[in-house]
UniProtKB/Swiss-Prot annotation:
GO terms for molecular function: flavin adenine dinucleotide binding. NAD(+) binds at residues 275-289. This is tRNA uridine 5-carboxymethylaminomethyl modification enzyme MnmG. It is found in: Cytoplasm. Belongs to the MnmG family. Its cofactor is FAD. PANTHER family: GLUCOSE INHIBITED DIVISION PROTEIN A (PTHR11806), PROTEIN MTO1 HOMOLOG, MITOCHONDRIAL (PTHR11806:SF0). GO terms for biological process: tRNA methylation; tRNA wobble uridine modification. NAD-binding protein involved in the addition of a carboxymethylaminomethyl (cmnm) group at the wobble position (U34) of certain tRNAs, forming tRNA-cmnm(5)s(2)U34. FAD binds at residues 16-21, 128, 183, 372. Keywords: Cytoplasm, FAD, Flavoprotein, NAD, tRNA processing. GO terms for cellular component: cytosol.
Length: 627
């Protein structure tokens, strides 16, 4: 094919406009880089291919972090959501999480508008079929119609599109998702360049016609009132919310599913890719948990101006006749019509251990990977990676050091470290349990952790940063006030003392000491402290958490300080593991495969013992001394 060179050269080229691609392109453009976003379909920018929702357990943490760094996802869901809830409100602050139902089409359209109006960002429709690589560096991309776009850096955010194959029963056909063509050729070139390309699988349920659902027989689930925004920049959300509905499968449903397993691509061996462990299909759940007589599903509206409903928990790749029978066996859905069939999709991904923590590939300089190409699942995981890839591609263009978030700084840092240190053989999703310092990585303090970083790279606007500094200052001032303000026994309200078991109080207590008690919150404190009632809610929340959990927080900070010694020791790129005495053959093999960037990463590789880490540390110090 004769290639046509496009007239303009770019700083950053992003291939793919899903949730990773959008954040990557916006970050690079907002940092002043001339950025090109290429996508197979401009009408599918930020399309929610699966559930119409943002956030959830640990995923809400990622969205808050994206927002704190200056990303767009939090603002977008605040502007287009139709129901908002805080999960785990009865548990500790470390595991509380925000979740919102989205108006699927409004979400897509608003994100597209934001990108169209973004300075330094160009959007073009085109399928990237190859990379331009010279002397171990990426120089640009080639599209299906023969246009070569040249750029200093390239970010691949291919989603489920690389050699995507859709399955409905034993019927399968190429597709990146329902209604879109797959990307062909790119994964073959990546394999030729030395990348390890694997195969994964995911799936989605049918979309149901709400006009054919009997909602009177289902249990409604309402959002929180008032709704709590995702973005630290959103003051409030005033739009009315829509309910979801809870339904359950039954034994008849399970019998129907079992009767169709001979035509299931999952159980007949047609699907080769590994599916998501934590988001199994309904046939998988029925077979893995035969003792369960029912499984829950939330019927989620896809928007205000559509009748389509998404039945979460009921994804399947069974044939369409079985799909009709299984959905209609559920109470309230006896007459339901399927508007879009459920399906499974297989796609190629690249082993993420071939990435640096900056998300730049180890094999090709200036090439970055983000999102499902790295083996992750979920919009939020993709967006977090996309944001970091966009930031680091822009920093490379600007000649600056990459921004790498530590495991003690952000869930984004935990996720990327997990991926590049351990790799993945199944779709990776974020959980709070993956973070060893989760009390430090709460949703509520994402701005305190990351706003400085976002402002330093140019993503957090000056006005947003000013408001953040004011909030941080007020938190510090309030903590100091509570340490000095006192409840004196001679002046205390007897009823207050009696209520909280302090009738024998002899010595003065500071308000900080009072607030440390589990039975006293700001609401109770305001009975004896008029100033407490005037403290802004966001400041109250921070102050109360910091006081009540002070001992636990200090303990985790001590753990972080010890771990940073390993994290701060970089392993030279040209360190020859084969000549270091004392390393076992297994350890050498693991180190040569994973090529860790730091001693901290090396310590997390399965099979690399503390003794081996000590030997590595000595080898690095000896090398530094001799040079």
């Amino acid at each position: 094919m004769n290639l046509i060179d496009y007239e303009k050269q770019y700083d950053v080229i992003v291939a793919g406009a899903g949730h990773a691609g959008c954040e990557a392109a916006l970050a690079a453009a907002r940092m002043g880089c001339e950025t090109l976003l290429l996508t197979i379909n401009l009408d599918a920018i930020a399309l929610m291919s699966c559930n119409p929702a943002i956030g959830g357990l640990a995923k809400g943490h990622l969205v808050k972090e994206i927002d704190a760094l200056g990303g767009e996802m939090g603002k977008n869901i605040d502007a287009t959501g139709i129901q908002y809830r805080i999960l785990n409100t009865r548990k500790g602050p470390a595991v509380r999480a925000s979740r919102a139902q989205a108006d699927k089409q409004l979400y897509r359209l608003r994100m597209k508008h934001v990108m169209e109006e973004q300075e330094h960002l160009s959007l073009k429709q085109g399928e990237v079929t190859g990379l331009v690589v010279e002397d171990g560096r990426v120089r640009g991309v080639v599209t299906k119609v023969g246009v070569r776009f040249l750029g200093k850096t390239v970010i691949l955010t291919t989603g489920t599109f690389m050699r995507g194959l859709i399955h409905v029963g034993l019927t399968n056909y190429p597709g990146g998702r329902a209604g879109d063509l797959p990307s062909v050729g790119l994964s073959d070139q990546l394999r030729d360049l030395g990348f390890t390309v694997g195969r994964l699988k995911t799936g989605t349920p049918a979309r149901l016609d709400g006009n054919t659902i009997d909602f009177s027989r289902l249990e409604p689930q309402y959002g929180d009132d008032p709704p709590v925004p995702f973005s630290f920049s959103t003051e409030r959300i005033d739009r009315p919310q829509l309910p979801c509905y809870i339904a359950y499968t039954n034994e008849r449903t399970h019998e129907i599913i079992r009767s169709g397993l001979d035509r299931s691509p999952l159980y007949s061996g047609v699907i080769e890719g590994v599916g998501p462990r934590y988001c199994p299909s309904i046939e998988d759940k029925v077979m893995r948990f035969p003792d369960k007589d029912r499984h829950q599903s939330f019927l989620e509206p896809e928007g205000r101006d559509t009748v389509e409903y998404y039945p979460s928990g009921l994804s399947t790749s069974l044939p369409i006749d079985i799909q009709y029978r299984l959905y209609r066996s559920i109470e309230g859905l006896e007459n339901v019509e399927i508007m879009r069939p459920a399906y499974a999709i297989e796609y190629d991904y690249v082993d993420p251990i071939q990435l640096h923590t900056s998300l730049e590939t180890k094999l090709i300089r200036n090439l970055y990977h983000a999102g499902q190409i790295n083996g992750t699942s979920g919009y939020e995981e993709a967006a977090g990676q996309g944001l970091m890839a966009g930031i680091n591609a822009a920093l490379r263009v600007q000649g600056e050091e990459p921004l790498v978030l530590g495991r003690d700084e952000a869930y984004i840092g935990v996720m990327i470290d997990d991926l590049v240190t351990l790799g993945t053989r199944e779709p990776y999703r974020m959980f709070t349990s993956r973070a060893e310092y989760r009390l430090l990585l709460r949703e509520d303090n994402a701005d305190l952790r990351l706003r400085e970083r976002g402002h330093a790279v140019g993503l957090v606007r000056d006005e947003e940063y000013r408001l953040f500094l004011e909030k941080r200052e007020r938190i510090g001032a309030e903590l100091e006030r509570l340490r000095t303000a006192k409840l004196l026994p001679s002046e205390a309200d007897p009823s207050f003392l009696e209520t909280y078991g302090m009738t024998d109080l002899r010595n003065a207590l500071t308000f900080e000491q009072l607030l440390r008690r589990p039975d006293i919150t700001y609401e109770e404190l305001s009975q004896i402290d008029p100033v407490a009632g005037m403290v802004p809610p966001s400041v109250k929340e921070q102050v109360e958490i910091q006081i009540k959990y002070q001992g636990y927080i200090e303990r985790q900070l001590d753990q972080v300080a010890r771990a940073r010694k390993l994290e701060g020791t970089r392993i030279p790129d040209d360190l020859d593991y084969t000549v270091i005495p004392g390393l076992s053959a297994e350890v050498r093999e693991k180190l040569l495969r994973f090529l860790p960037d730091t001693l901290g990463q090396a310590s997390r590789i399965q099979g690399v013992t503390p003794a081996a880490v000590g030997i590595l540390s000595v080898a690095i110090k000896s090398r530094s001394a001799s040079s």
